[in-house]
A protein has these predicted regions:
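A short, acidic, amphipathic alpha-helical segment used as a generic capping/interface helix at domain edges
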Residues: 306-317
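Nucleotide/phosphate-binding catalytic cleft detector across ATP-hydrolyzing
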Residues: 1-17, 21-76, 80-207, 225-227, ...
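Glycine-rich phosphate-binding/hydrolytic loop that grips phosphoryl groups
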Residues: 353-401
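Short, charged, surface-exposed secondary-structure boundary motifs
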Residues: 46, 195, 241-244, 360-366
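Acidic-glycine-rich active-site phosphate/pyrophosphate-binding loop
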Residues: 32, 212-214, 342-359
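Glycine-rich phosphate-binding loops at beta-strand->alpha-helix junctions
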Residues: 16, 263-266, 323-346
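Phosphate/oxyanion-binding active-site loops and adjacent basic polyanion-contact surfaces
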Residues: 51-55, 300-307, 369-373
């Protein structure tokens, strides 16, 4: 249960920055964001602690700065992250009802069996999230719990998100060294969807692609549930490094070029001269030589195609097809110009580019910089009706359905 009137914290562990947000909810359920802070990330790569000492110092610095602004001290904190090592597994459990009513005990049995199977399948994994996808009653799909419905057969489809226990131990260790306890972990993909997608988009089917600096994350949502997610350890920086390696340019020059590319590939006159060679102004430190437009654009296309092909395989495997009505969104965190147009051409569907300050009532820089934290705040404050492990979500929340309540305060 959420502690009202006490300051609570959310921290996002990113590759470039660590972000902390401290908030408070009073007895009237009114939210107050007390402070935020951003510090440079160290000792963390793609959500994984790779250097305990550096990560601890960076985390401590970020939390301390936020605590100082909020004039409060945190004992626990919610951690937002995304790792390529996250595993997303879909389970379907079945039970014979034999013409009787479906009771809560029947659903509880299926939930327990699924959770038990996940833990037995890989003892080295820890469960981060469980989502209810849907129920199948005598061949018919039910979105909500089919309590008191007469049936012969009940199936329950669930999605489990897990992470390696050793990764979790290292995260806990870093925060313990900061004298703070991890309250819960929240997938960054889930948090971004909670912040940026509306109820209809989450209900009827959406695909969210978040292209980051060192990784690309994919989340597929339907019936208000995360039905599939995966993170690939390849991102925008790989385009920069490809240009650098193949064209013998330094990384600074390659980044400037990457940022200037029009990914609709219709107009790149800013980069190239009338003979279609890279303009000399982009050779900041390297010696000028002829580098053709086709070479640079082919390098960028090849890396993008590699990323999108991996994503396409995942989408096809789940059956959530953007050409058949599912919404497809790409996050603008990478800031590649006209990336959504190339994405639309690749997937054969209209792709919408999301800005992290998409809401019209945006709080400006707060929404832009802290979209993941604000999404996590929404999940923590209101609960998520299809999520099964919000043990620390306010039990008075109206959005906390039976599926969530079942796991509340259970091991």
């Amino acid at each position: 249960m959420m502690n009202h009137e006490h300051s609570q914290g959310i921290i996002e562990l990113g590759n470039i920055n660590i972000k902390c947000l401290i908030f408070k909810i009073n007895s009237n359920d009114i939210l107050e964001i007390q402070s935020t802070s951003i510090t440079q990330s160290e000792g963390i790569h793609n959500g994984v602690i790779v250097n305990i000492s550096k990560a601890t110092n960076a985390i401590r610095s970020c939390i301390s700065a936020a605590e100082k602004k909020a004039k409060s001290s945190l004992k626990k904190i919610n951690v937002v992250l995304e790792q390529p090592e996250f595993l997303c597994t879909k389970f379907s459990k079945h039970k014979k009802i034999d013409g009787s009513k479906i009771h809560k005990d029947d659903i509880e049995f299926l939930l327990k069996e699924a959770k038990k199977q996940v833990m037995l399948n890989d003892e080295k994994q820890s469960i981060i999230h469980i989502f209810n996808h849907n129920y199948i009653v005598d061949g018919k799909t039910f979105i909500e719990e089919p309590i008191d419905v007469y049936a012969d057969y009940l199936s329950h489809e669930m999605t489990f998100v897990t992470m390696p226990k050793n990764n979790l131990k290292n995260i806990n260790k870093a925060f313990i060294d900061c004298d703070i306890e991890v309250e819960r972990l929240i997938s960054c993909t889930f948090a971004l969807a909670a912040k940026l997608l509306n109820n209809n988009e989450l209900q009827f089917g959406s695909i969210l692609i978040d292209m980051g600096y060192e990784k690309t994350s994919l989340g597929l949502f339907k019936n208000l549930a995360l039905v599939h997610s995966i993170t690939f350890p390849v991102g925008i920086n790989h385009i920069i490094k490809d240009i650098s390696n193949i064209c013998s340019l330094n990384l600074e020059e390659s980044k400037i070029i990457s940022d200037k590319i029009d990914f609709s590939f219709q107009n790149n006159k800013e980069l190239f001269d009338k003979n279609d060679y890279l303009k000399d102004i982009y050779f900041k430190n390297s010696n000028y030589r002829r580098i053709s437009q086709s070479l640079i654009l082919d390098i960028a296309k090849a890396r993008l195609d590699e990323i999108f092909e991996m994503i396409q395989k995942q989408i096809i495997a789940t059956g959530l097809n953007p050409t058949l009505g599912a919404n497809l969104f790409i996050l603008g965190g990478s800031n590649l110009f006209n990336l959504e147009k190339y994405c639309s051409n690749f997937f054969g569907s209209n792709v919408k580019k999301l800005d992290k300050n998409i809401e019209k009532e945006s709080q400006g820089e707060l929404d832009t910089q802290f979209a993941s934290c604000l999404g996590a705040l929404k999940i923590i404050k209101d609960g998520w009706e299809t999520e099964a492990i919000p043990e620390l979500v306010d039990e008075n929340s109206q959005k906390l359905g039976f599926f969530a309540k079942f796991f509340q305060n259970k091991p």
